[in-house]
Amino acid sequence: NYNCDQLIYNDCNFKVRELLETFKNEDTVEIYKYIEKMIKIYKLEHGVKEPYLKIRELYNTTPIENRDPKLLYLLVLYGFQQQIRFNSSYDYNNPVGQAGFNDKLAEKLISYCRNLKEKNVSFYSRDFTDMDDLINKNTFVYCDPPYLITLGSYNDGKRGFNGWNETEEIRLLKYLEKLNKKGVKFMLSNVLEHKNQKNNLLIDWINKNGFKVIEYDGKARKNRNEIIVVNYEVSDYE
């Protein structure tokens, strides 16, 4: 919802980047037709293991550089909790789940592709500290890293990509300090507390720099205190 002339999307997972590039650059109708065709050919159904394993094998036995992002999207739709998981060889290794493609998801896909095509977006898969050539004082930076004190398929270090740990957390926080000193406005999504565990690194960093904290719905929920951290006066942008 941020009004801007250009969007820059950076994700360490280059497979996610390729998927978004596909949504932007390929014809939306052709994407939809591909999904419908593959569902019919392989008789995909939510919770049914055998057809799912066939398309997963098709994806994994294709050379990495030739793997179709649309097939990855199909795997995500029918995979467990719709997660994006890879092993160290970049083979997709998520088991079958209980979800699938339906009319509601089709509407969301079409709407998302249309919106993406209307925007001026550039896609990257760089380390977050290597973005300086794309950032200036007029840039607004939003960071949504893995949450240090929660466990996800993206931050256990076993999914074919770099895991998230205290070292990475410190690197990110130091980089945001660097942006702040340059006068660049940023927003960071994170979690202060989860199941009685606190992210003391983040708490100390916020207090040291005097950054603003916004809680989702103004309160903690389900033993999980999700927050947004900003380095500017929120009232200026309301």
Predicted regions and their residues:
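Alpha-helix boundary recognition
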Residues: 21, 74, 116-117, 177, ...
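Conserved S-adenosyl-L-methionine
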Residues: 1-41
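Short active-site-adjacent helix-start/loop capping segments
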Residues: 16-19, 82, 196
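SAM-dependent nucleic-acid methyltransferase catalytic core
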Residues: 25-142, 146-157, 171
